[in-house]
């Protein structure tokens, strides 16, 4: 333990550091950890007092009581009354909760973060500086830096507190609104982006499309006139004096047949009305309507094709490329976000179903055997064990690959039932094929949509369908990765598969040594590391935290710092580096 007495003259530079303490809450049962300190003991490593009064406060009465019980550690009969404790966050962080659950369902290990305050007011928080008995740090948390650890632990604390504190209906409503707001904004931005792109393409492509169609109709009219005149001449020469057919009558009959042929070739256009005024653009049928433009930009973002319309102008082509560069990531981010919600909902439903089935089986077993068995309560201190199995281990939900295929097929079937209500001429198979092509980004074909409700349904079907596909891929990724690994390593040795935590730590250690050296790590480097870190490591008694001792700031005092703790900015000061270099001249950079 390191304490600072205000009677010592302050030095020009000042930095305070606090190591973790174990908190014994009165409402928690910590088992064999009862013998540890039952109060929060501050440890301050400092060469001088922090001058800012806002950063310090008096040591609590509990600490004074503990000090009274350890009067033999003091030179006088009474402990000094001017001790100061570094102000830290009053919130204790849950550390390695999963490990504590495996030991006992009623054990919970709490620890406080390490907090360092610099002269400029910067606060450095380190959550991974100590290993407590029964709650070891895993390899992933050990590789986190201080900022990442602080973020993870802080989020966990906030979630736990939110779950425990009862909230009123307005508070719950505000909470859900805050959760839904960014996702609603994301979907709204995507829909607005689609509408903006459709409107811009309509402005760019409408006149070009109408002019091209007008020229086509003028050519068709001239062709029909020339063919009529030439045919009449041929017919008149062939039947000179034999037939009494009038020219106008013959032209009208022949023109009608040609119009019918044109309507057969282009059955989606009102060609009979357009032929009456081929030079009038307002009389032309425009295929760049808002529904077709929406479908086109939708196919651009979903990387599928649409055969009804295409971009012809150079400006429109450039705009389509720029629109796709921004819109494609936006589309897939939105689909991934919705898919994540769907996957979490599905996992929660399956987890709830499994718990319900397990409880029903336990209840039936009690009735069958005629004896009462205590079941896990749904309230109280075991709320955190809802997602755990009977043995206290976390359940791993598994779905066969066929379940994901069935999910996509069911969604396409629902869409086909919706499509055939709007397109009466479609069969179920045709509608199913159309919906499947939409969500797997094959293409829209050459469908022409005139109803805005049907258009909205298609857009919603595509966005939600991509989310469903993303959800299925997200849930099946673990199994697909396992199958791919088996295929990839078929007939070969599987390297680094099923690696234990110890091996992973060794690999991480070698990586840190390689980054420090800047080249290949040799056996001599590993041997030097083992000699410096294992042979020269000072001994730390197991009951170190159970005793209160004064240790002045000498090299031996600094050696009690745990060798595996991350260095905060306090440890990077020149004075400390000099002192540590004297103890461990070849200390690795990652320590």
From Swiss-Prot:
One of its GO terms (molecular function) is outward rectifier potassium channel activity. Residues 1-24 are annotated as: Disordered. The keyword Ligase does not apply. It is a multi-pass membrane protein. InterPro entries: 2pore_dom_K_chnl, K_chnl_dom. Keywords: Glycoprotein, Ion channel, Ion transport, Membrane, Transmembrane, Transmembrane helix, Transport. Signal peptide: none annotated. GO terms for cellular component: plasma membrane. Glycans are attached at residue 226. One of its GO terms (biological process) is potassium ion transmembrane transport. SUPFAM superfamilies: Voltage-gated potassium channels. It is found in: Membrane. Disruption phenotype: Worms exhibit defects in mobility. Mutation causes a dumpy (dpy) phenotype thought to be due to hyper-activation of body-wall muscle. Severe mutations cause paralysis thought to be a result of fully contracted muscles. The chain crosses the membrane at residues 184-204, 289-309, 318-338, 400-420, 428-448, 453-473. Belongs to the two pore domain potassium channel (TC 1.A.1.8) family. Has a role in mobility, possibly in the transport of potassium in muscles. This is Uncoordinated protein 58. The lineage of its organism: Eukaryota, Metazoa, Ecdysozoa, Nematoda, Chromadorea.
């Amino acid at each position: 333990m390191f304490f600072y007495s205000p009677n010592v003259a302050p030095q020009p530079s000042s930095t305070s550091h606090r190591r973790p303490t174990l908190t014994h809450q009165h409402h928690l049962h910590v088992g064999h950890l009862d013998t540890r300190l039952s109060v929060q003991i501050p440890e301050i490593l400092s060469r001088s007092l922090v001058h800012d009064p806002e950063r310090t406060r008096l040591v609590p009465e509990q600490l004074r009581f503990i000090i009274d019980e350890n009067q033999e550690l003091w030179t006088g009969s009474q402990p000094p009354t001017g001790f100061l404790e570094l102000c830290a966050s009053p919130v204790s962080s849950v550390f390695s909760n999963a490990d504590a659950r495996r030991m006992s369902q009623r054990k919970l290990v709490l620890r406080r973060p390490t907090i360092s305050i610099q002269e400029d007011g910067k606060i450095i928080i380190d959550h991974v500086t100590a290993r407590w008995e029964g709650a070891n740090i895993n390899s992933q948390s050990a590789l986190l830096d201080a900022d990442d650890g602080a973020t993870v632990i802080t989020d966990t604390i906030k979630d736990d507190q939110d779950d425990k504190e009862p909230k009123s209906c307005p508070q719950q409503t505000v909470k859900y609104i805050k959760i839904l707001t960014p996702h609603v904004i994301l979907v709204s931005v995507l829909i607005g982006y689609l509408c903006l792109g459709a409107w811009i393409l309509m402005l760019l492509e409408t006149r070009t499309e109408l002019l091209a169609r007008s020229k086509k109709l003028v050519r068709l009219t001239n062709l029909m006139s020339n063919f009529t005149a030439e045919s009449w001449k041929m017919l008149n020469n062939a039947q000179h004096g034999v037939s009494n057919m009038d020219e106008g009558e013959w032209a009208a009959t022949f023109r009608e047949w040609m119009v019918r042929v044109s309507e057969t070739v282009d059955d989606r256009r009102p060609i009979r009305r357009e032929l009456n005024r081929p030079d009038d653009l307002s009389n032309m049928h425009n295929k760049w309507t808002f529904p077709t433009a929406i479908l086109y930009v939708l196919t651009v973002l979903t990387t599928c094709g649409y055969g009804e319309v295409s971009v012809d102008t150079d400006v429109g082509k450039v705009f389509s490329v720029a629109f796709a560069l921004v819109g494609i990531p936006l589309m897939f981010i939105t689909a991934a976000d919705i898919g994540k919600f769907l996957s979490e909902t599905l996992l929660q439903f399956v987890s709830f179903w499994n718990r319900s089935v397990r409880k029903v089986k336990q209840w039936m077993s009690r009735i069958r055997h005629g004896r009462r068995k205590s079941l896990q309560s749904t309230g109280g201190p075991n709320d955190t064990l809802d997602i755990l199995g009977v043995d206290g281990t976390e359940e791993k939900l598994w779905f066969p690959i066929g379940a994901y295929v069935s999910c996509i097929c069911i969604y396409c079937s629902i869409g086909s039932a919706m499509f055939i209500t709007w397109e009466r001429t479609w069969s179920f198979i045709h509608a199913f094929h159309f919906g499947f092509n939409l969500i797997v980004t094959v293409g829209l074909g050459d469908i022409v949509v005139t109803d805005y409700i049907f258009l909205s349904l298609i857009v919603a079907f595509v966005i939600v369908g991509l989310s469903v596909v993303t959800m299925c891929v997200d849930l099946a990724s673990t199994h697909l990765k396992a199958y791919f690994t088996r295929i990839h390593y078929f007939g070969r040795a599987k390297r680094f598969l099923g690696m234990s935590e110890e091996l992973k730590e060794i690999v991480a250690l070698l990586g840190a040594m390689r980054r420090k050296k800047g080249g290949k790590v040799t056996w001599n480097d590993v041997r030097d590391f083992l000699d410096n870190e294992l042979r020269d490591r000072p001994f730390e008694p197991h009951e170190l935290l159970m005793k209160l001792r004064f240790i002045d700031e000498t090299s031996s005092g600094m050696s009690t710092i745990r060798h595996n703790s991350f260095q905060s900015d306090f440890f990077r000061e020149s004075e400390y580096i000099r002192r540590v270099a004297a103890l461990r001249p070849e200390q690795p950079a990652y320590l």
